[in-house]
């Protein structure tokens, strides 16, 4: 790991090592600790392929075809996607597991990533049962506007936290389109007003966001809340600015309080004190005006240690709110590149740890949000490259045309 010392020259992303790290993740077995998370294989696949995309590493035609076949094999017959085939019985179709929101989100992103060229991009969602997926999402919404993760035994399960609202909002934007009742592609929508009301009820006394106003605020929940609202406001063409921000305005009652909460997540990294006293490491917060030098990390909650991923959760949230200048970017960039960038590629959670896929991907996302020249431009709302978002928009248009009988997908023209 790089030395945590200041330098006159700004630190740089070791791009080739990160490419090698992600290529290993793509082509070889993952380390044994990942075994327990095999049911979330779609998530790891999306991190891997999206990281390579951010690093401008193209997929081969064979890889693109393989990704597409595998993702579609995990589509559930009742709507949505399963995270992997782990929970299906021997000899049973992989898609007979349980669909969940996270897997469905990552499946759609992966299908977009696996397309190259206009024809492939327009056919990227061919094979996705759009109507079943959108209807399935409606079954996950409770009367209070919150969403669960999946349906088990006829009941919505998985808590009421903002992650589910975010994932539902993303899937809705990627698939629904600007379709009016009476159109062949019409599917009844989720209750958007109740979704916004649920997010609104999640803001806490300190300006942050939690599952409800009585729970502990968390920067990750803040990102999911703002992401959910932003996707509700986003035009079908993401290159256009929203004409209104009704969801964002209605869903955040205390905007200044949220800025204060997010700005307070940034604090000076104290390497020497970490060595002297493990109990006190990274707990001291500093005033924003004193953060011009050194390394500055982020935590997700009050009185917690710095963590690579919160450079993303905080920075991404402020970017969506149009207030990224609230934080001091250069020392945050130094923290990521000097402290948690690993010698074998990837990023660790904190100083001294090994790299892992979650923190390695969100570390890249944070740097892309800061405008790192070695990375593609990032769509902060979907946490993928803007190029991938454009592919998803073309995939949506192609799918809607196919539903209306105006265009055939891959299965119809024998592309694969």
What kind of feature is each model-predicted range?
Residues 1-416:
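Preference for long, amphipathic alpha-helical scaffolds in soluble/luminal domains
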């Amino acid at each position: 790991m790089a030395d945590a010392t200041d330098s006159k020259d700004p630190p740089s992303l070791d791009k080739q090592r990160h490419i090698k790290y992600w290529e290993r993740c793509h082509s070889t077995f993952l380390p044994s600790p990942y075994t327990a998370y095999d049911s979330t294989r779609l998530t790891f696949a999306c991190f891997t392929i999206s990281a390579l995309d951010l690093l401008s590493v193209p997929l081969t035609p064979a890889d693109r075809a393989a990704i597409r076949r595998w993702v579609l094999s995990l589509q559930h017959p009742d709507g949505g996607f399963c995270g992997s085939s782990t929970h299906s019985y021997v000899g049973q179709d992989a898609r007979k597991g349980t669909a969940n929101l996270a897997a469905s989100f990552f499946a759609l992103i992966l299908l977009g990533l696996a397309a190259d060229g206009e024809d492939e991009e327009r056919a990227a969602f061919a094979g996705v049962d759009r109507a079943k997926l959108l209807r399935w999402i409606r079954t996950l919404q409770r009367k209070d506007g919150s969403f669960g993760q999946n349906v088990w035994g006829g009941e919505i399960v998985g808590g009421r936290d903002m992650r589910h609202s975010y994932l539902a909002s993303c899937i809705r934007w990627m698939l629904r389109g600007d379709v009016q009742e009476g159109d062949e592609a019409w599917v009844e929508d989720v209750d958007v007003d109740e979704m916004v009301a649920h997010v609104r009820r999640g803001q806490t006394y300190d300006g942050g966001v939690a599952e409800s106003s009585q729970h502990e605020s968390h920067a990750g929940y803040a990102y999911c809340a703002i992401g959910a609202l932003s996707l509700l406001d986003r035009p079908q063409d993401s290159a256009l600015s929203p004409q209104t921000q009704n969801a964002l305005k209605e869903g955040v009652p205390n905007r200044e309080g949220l800025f204060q909460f997010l700005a307070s997540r940034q604090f000076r990294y104290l390497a020497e004190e970490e060595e002297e006293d493990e109990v006190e490491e990274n707990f001291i917060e500093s005033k924003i005006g004193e953060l011009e030098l050194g390394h500055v990390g982020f935590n997700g909650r009050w009185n917690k240690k710095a963590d690579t991923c919160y450079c993303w959760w905080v920075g991404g949230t402020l970017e969506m709110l149009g207030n990224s200048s609230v934080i001091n970017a250069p020392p945050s960039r130094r923290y990521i590149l000097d402290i948690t960038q690993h010698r074998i590629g990837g990023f660790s959670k904190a100083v001294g740890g090994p790299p892992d896929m979650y923190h390695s991907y969100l570390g890249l996302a944070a740097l892309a949000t800061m405008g790192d020249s070695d990375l593609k431009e990032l769509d902060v709302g979907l946490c993928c490259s803007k190029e991938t978002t454009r592919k998803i928009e073309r995939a949506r248009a192609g799918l809607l045309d196919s539903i209306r009988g105006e265009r055939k997908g891959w299965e119809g023209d024998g592309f694969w």
